[in-house]
Amino acid sequence: MINIKTIIRIIGILLLLETTMFLGCSGVSLYYGEGDSFAFWKAGAITAGIGLLLVALGKGGNHQLTRRDGYVLVSVAWIAFTLFGMLPFYIGGYIPDITNAFFETMSGFTSTGATILDNIEAQPHGILFWRSMTQWIGGLGIIMFTIAILPIFGVSGLQVFAAESSVSTHDKVHPRIGITAKWIWSVYTSITALLVILLMLGGMDWFDSICHAFATTGTGGFSTKQASVAYYNSPYIEYVISIFMFTSGINFTLLLLFVNRKFKKMFSNAELKFYFGSVVFFTTIIAVTLFYTSPMGAEESFRKSLFQVISLHTSTGFATDDYMNWKPVLWGLLTIIMVMGACAGSTTGGLKCIRMVILTKVSRNEIKHIIHPNAVLPVRINKQVVAPSTVSTVLAFCFLYITIIVASILLMSAMGIGFAESIGCVISSISNMGPGLGETGPAYSWSALPDLAKWLLSFLMLIGRLELFTVLLLFTPEFWRQN
């Protein structure tokens, strides 16, 4: 049986936490003397009331969550956070349409960064701060935050972590996962704070620095400017953000190794080497192409290509140039990068590099099997044999990922959306990327899409952020059977 009471209680606790975030954003509104503080107070009152009710209704539940409970909790938590998180946008009239308000909030909490706003600079500071905060909270995971504080309430967070996490196959979940989660949040917060300081040194004011730091470490890509990072026209800011986007694309368990000075173990990691090599490879190709086919000089070609490759590789979605003005062959390369993603166990979306490593090794072994039919060729990563069941899961995930992309592109096309735009929107959403192709590229918003398309893309953002199986399991009859 699903532990309904405990799940309800945890959702209530999360809503109370979301209320405190609303109050923080209202403080920003008051600081700037803008009227959006009322929207946060109203949203906070509604959210707190529902949260307290759920906490009361959830008393007396079994505090030990099963794995099945974890899957339900993760999906429901994300949807609940989005439904209540959209209230400041909707109540304040800043996004008066429910579909658009839900889309914008889901885009934030899934760290996608696709926006329907056509006038970002016209929004009040509190609303922009909340918009930026959604991707920072969603980046590492509402549930990662949950399991760090669940032990305080006597609830085990282990099964929640197993459901939400996209840790790589060779990583083991620590038995005291709450401690691990707190360490990861400490690193996450420290990286964010350091980036704020560096951006301020580059000329950004404190507000824009915090918002862009949230967007960078959360790999969300929401900017406070319609032109994104290109607005600042600053090589310093572009290089700094590039470095921190790359860092945020690294598995956080590897960053903990760095903090603990276990450099050899960190830099020998197969996934990290693949990630770094991929960034170097694509940056080189695109930089050389831009140098010979555009008016850019050598440094600018390198900087623009490095920034865009890392931005799309980490599913951040910031832009310093409209890549739709680049040669069409580069659109294909950028689309491949969108699908690949960065490291598992990071704030990024996409297939993840660890799956690419496994697919590469499986393909290589199959070629060898043709030459040596009787050879036993296990897949090894970091000198450890990957279990056949894990390989099967990776293959199934990739097949399902591609199938959903193809089916969604066909659905989008059936709605009258251009084929290039359909491809860009679908891949961008399921990979939690942000900008797409064509009329949904980095220079445009997604406001012109029909409502049905926005609901479909919101669903793709959710399943992409939660690694497909977490959500899709809920639609299988077997999941709900008692045994």
Predicted regions and their residues:
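Membrane-proximal intracellular helices of multi-pass ion channels
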Residues: 1-483
